[in-house]
Amino acid sequence: MRLSWLLRKSFDFGEREVAHWFPGHMAKGLKQMKTKLKNLDCIVEVHDARIPLSGRNPIFQDSLGMKPHLLILNKMDLADLTQKKRILAQLKQQGVGNVIFTDCVKDQNIKHVVPVISELVGCSQRFHREENTETCIMVIGVPNVGKSSLINALRRMHLRKGKASRVGAEPGITRSVLTKIQVSESPLIFLFDTPGVLSPRIESVETGMKLALCGTILDHLVGEDIMADYLLYILNQQMQHRYVEHYGLEKPCADIETLLKRIALKLGKTQKVKAITGVGDVNITVPNYNAAAYDFIRTFRRGQLGVVMLD
């Protein structure tokens, strides 16, 4: 079946502006990170594997110095890894040569993290740290990419211990730089967890939308209606039509209102509204499009609509 009619040439973001979506530049968290800098041997940056090139905060590189750096691309189970070779090549062009794809929920590739950290630290000069036998690292990244999940996964694997950091599905769970957390006994490694810090300047509206779909920005700051529409656009662009079966559609759909109506009816998400008629006010039942958009976005985030690569 030819589906070229589904492919919009581009997505219309309307008059939206990126600056209206984001809180302040989270200077408090960044200031806390800087105070710990002299005690660090390595920076571990965690980012979402679905947006490996978008939204990484350049302030981290500018403010946290020339410490050894490891990029963890987490949530690999949700990403289309057929694009992995291209992504690694582009990251290398940007000067990022140490990259590990992980799934912290299933501990996939977690075993590689400590050996890579040890190698990076072993090959670097430890200014003001020569007398210390332990390795101290800081885990950084934008909100809700799995920083705390990585810490807990490392503790499960190397210490057989439980959670040291709270994990949540919304950005902003970790509010401050914590005290030292041990994640390995041999080699002896401690780390600092940090709050998610967004860049004060997002390069484009589309980059902001990608960040929103991955949950690094609170949904209401963007609008679930346009997020759902952009998600449908992306799924159709990548020929990822699992939503058709999931929501019981007959075929792929290009119109977000049609899709949301179907989702609302399938899930029983309706609401009563007052309509003014010639015989007076009448209560009518209509689909709850907001509830449908909410379900569509979260079903995608759980991986039930297939894997994607947003970059």
From Swiss-Prot:
Keyword entries, A-Z: GTP-binding, Membrane, Mitochondrion, Mitochondrion inner membrane, Nucleotide-binding, Transit peptide, Translation regulation
Signal peptide (UniProt feature, chain positions): none
PROSITE patterns cross-referenced by the UniProt entry: G_CP
Domain of life: Eukaryota
Cited Gene3D superfamilies: 1.10.1580.10, P-loop containing nucleotide triphosphate hydrolases
Keyword Transit peptide: yes
GO MF annotation, one: GTP binding
Pfam families (UniProt xref): MMR_HSR1
Subcellular localization(s) per the UniProt record: Mitochondrion inner membrane
CP-type G domain mapped to chain residues: 27-200
InterPro entries documented for this protein: G_CP_dom (IPR030378), GTP-bd (IPR006073), GTP-bd_ortho_bundle_sf (IPR023179), GTPase_MTG1 (IPR016478), P-loop_NTPase (IPR027417)
Family in the record: Belongs to the TRAFAC class YlqF/YawG GTPase family. MTG1 subfamily.
Functional summary from the UniProt entry: Plays a role in the regulation of the mitochondrial ribosome assembly and of translational activity. Displays mitochondrial GTPase activity.
Name the UniProt record assigns to this protein: Mitochondrial ribosome-associated GTPase 1
